[in-house]
Amino acid sequence: MGLFAFLFGRKKKDTSQALQQPAAVASHAPGTQIAYSPDLIPKLKTEHQQLLEIFGKINAAFAKNDLSLTARFLEDFRREIQSHLLTENIRFYIYLEHSLVQHMESLSLMHEFRQEMNAIGKAVLAFLNKYKDIGTRPDFALPFSRDLEDVGKILVDRIKREEETLYPLYFPVY
């Protein structure tokens, strides 16, 4: 009678332990010591939001013609984007490269994104280097305005495509 009661809803199964124990996953991508982390994608998405927030502060400071504050936010942005790119390159791309080895289409897509991100990263860092002294160089204001707008468009587009297309490829290897 206990089985029928369980099947037809008279008894509830105790799921508290099942909820507390994570599902078993392989600890590393094949051939690496890079482990799958269920927290990685939420962390990267949070970093994206932080980067966009700092970028908004750069825009706001520049709009107020506060070049000193603009320079400080540019340095904050540099620090955050370098950290983000390092995390993506080490924990995300290397893991994907090894875990997608049997999925050539997805692997090819990941390589395209990685090459594009490397180019974007270099361009953004060149932008940051070019304008690091904007706080003491008001003559930088006009070209900075145009370049800032371009970087903003590239950043927003890249984040959107990364989160919609690339991040779903990250999953545990069994």
Go through each PLM region and give its residues.
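Small-residue-biased structural context
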Residues: 1-174
